[in-house]
């Protein structure tokens, strides 16, 4: 009897072990498959361009996003009309729109972006920064423009939140005036072009300034330097937080798609103004200021897209040599002209990529994007200024209207100081390339930039539209520039 009970217990144990073993055999392949998929996902992370190309993340929530965007659009178009309640999501969006507005002016070198940025700098409701990413490019030279795009985006995120501590990472160890006397904190003197910043060069940061912040007019850099002692960046951060609109202008971001994570951030409330200019006029202006743009052009040429083609050229001239290698001085013309021309090819490719990118963008993103041509801005400064202010949520000012008009009706093109902002002759600025570029130079630019030129409605030299343009003395306005655009 006892033997029978013992055998029964052993049989039950054996059955239980067999069941557990079978279950384990079933679970092991599933666990292994799950682990391999995770490893594969970690090794094969989709790139930004592939992730954004079909806008799949937006499509998943298209209905609710588009509905909220429509409500916001209707409210902006008719302030007296109360939008229909849309639940918690609508409340979140409403709170975001009441927060700060952030604007990024997306441009490239010699497109007139300093003038466009100055319109924001003059507005009393705007806190404006001029090319803060200059510090990053200088600190990491000779770098790769493409590989620096992520760092530029992260810097933008911090600066838009009025956190300037990121600038310490790229500060040059030099002038003691750039540091506060009581600490290691940086001061406003380290900022690129700080002497023309309206916030830095007016009260309360500069009590002795001759102009109030609300007065519209260019800041004299020498006068600001003599009357406005540097203040810690913490004080500038405090001023930044007071303004309803923060605008940053820069020329070193080559891919609009890099900004999509910031545009998606509901707490950032970011919009982008992208400025274009006739590539032939850009090339003419770049040649005039070739020595000031040579380092920047080399950074552009070191991108992976053209690395194989141009790396041998750069190394042959000893420019941007690999660590440990011998590096010579920057080349002089005509080799400098070659670098500038080649960099323009990369820039035109970036323009084309951005134009196609925005064409396939969802409605919510297109409403946060404004496309503007320099030629339209200087021929119709007041019309384009009102369009710009409406997009940015800023009030119109008669003094700013007059400022924009007078800045485009100067007496000269300003060739003596190409990096100095002053009133220019709009006609001369638009058409100077026709007299200063050779036929071969024009042909090279048009060959490299033709796809982008066609999308931006710039006629090739010699065709029927171009002949009419020369006869009338102005560039035809872009006909499809009003998709919010």
Curated annotation (Swiss-Prot):
Q: Give the Gene3D superfamilies listed for this entry.
A: P-loop containing nucleotide triphosphate hydrolases
Residue ranges spanning the membrane: these are 13-33
GO molecular function terms attached to this record: chondroitin 6-sulfotransferase activity; N-acetylglucosamine 6-O-sulfotransferase activity
- Residues that, per the record, bind 3'-phosphoadenylyl sulfate: 109-115, 277-285
Keywords in alphabetical order, please.
Answer: Carbohydrate metabolism, Glycoprotein, Golgi apparatus, Membrane, Phosphoprotein, Signal-anchor, Transferase, Transmembrane, Transmembrane helix
Protein name per its UniProtKB record = Carbohydrate sulfotransferase 7
One record GO biological process: N-acetylglucosamine metabolic process
Task: Indicate, by first and last residue, each region the UniProt record lists as having compositional bias (Basic and acidic residues).
Answer: 465-475
Gene symbol of the encoding locus: Chst7
Q: What is its EC number?
A: 2.8.2.-, 2.8.2.17
Q: Which residues are glycosylated?
A: 88, 185, 406
